[in-house]
Amino acid sequence: MTTDDDSAPFGRSLCAMVTPFTGSGALDLDGAQRLADRLVARGCDGLVLSGTTGESPTTTDAEKAALVTAVREAVGDRAALVAGVGTADTRHTVELALAAEKAGADGLLVVAPYYSRPPQDALEAHFREVADASGLPVMLYDIPGRTGTRIEPDTVVRLAAHPRIVAVKDCAYDLLGTQKVLSRTGLAYYAGCDEQILPLYAIGAAGYVSTVANVVPELFRAVLDAFDAGDTGRAALLQRRAVPLVESMMAAGLPGTVTAKALLGALGLPAGPVRAPLRSADRETTAGLLAAYGELAADAGQSQA
């Protein structure tokens, strides 16, 4: 399900969903369905599957397709499903894009090819080839801290002319570059870093793709709702209130995949272990995450009292 709103083609509130595994490390499709249903019921317009948080480097092609199929069965047309298909290999990325389309995805998340560090003209050609290969809309994924390659703003502007390149997941930490693209294209920008959700929304972003939303899907939806209602003070308060949990999950030295799964597991929700080379969080880390979560829950309860 994509929306009729060109400014937010996949909705506003998206979760970068973890990929649940069983205790032995096998794909847990039942857990994925239960988690997806919970996220959508609590305010997510869309789910990004097999992204960074979804451990895409360590899931097989068959697992990626099976995950899309299972989650589609769980959420029906209540949410947009954006499938992560980006790899370091253009041919492989095209294969994954076609498989995701067949499995029922609504869109594709395509990260810049990593490790080989292609120049901008090669990067542009890569994205065009992937976008040409299927009928699904594409969300570019700019996360140079992980890929080693920036999708430069001028490259994004050129790619915006492609009819199926409709959005960007922005993890570049370049506010000027983001504004440059927003001012020159109709691309929908999605904040890919939880601490930047309100700042980017305030300058015209479509919404967000959040890792923290795995645990608190209502939180950042409330930020956007307050801003849309004209209550910018409350929007800012809610964004600041999230800082301890965002810091614990995203800025404490561990990948968000690890912390999200640890906290979900501690709360009795589907998650399971991470796959190697990642390692699951230890008890001390999990206790700290629970403390930050409890603080946020207490603050929310007081504000509603």
Swiss-Prot record:
Signal sequence interval, chain numbering: none
Entry-linked Pfam families: DHDPS (PF00701)
Principal cellular location given in the protein's record: cytoplasm
Binding site for pyruvate: T53, V209
Location of this chain's protein in the cell: Cytoplasm
PROSITE patterns, sorted: DHDPS_1, DHDPS_2
PANTHER family noted in UniProt: 4-HYDROXY-2-OXOGLUTARATE ALDOLASE, MITOCHONDRIAL (PTHR12128:SF66), DIHYDRODIPICOLINATE SYNTHASE (PTHR12128)
Protein name per UniProt: 4-hydroxy-tetrahydrodipicolinate synthase 1
Origin species: Streptomyces coelicolor (strain ATCC BAA-471 / A3(2) / M145)
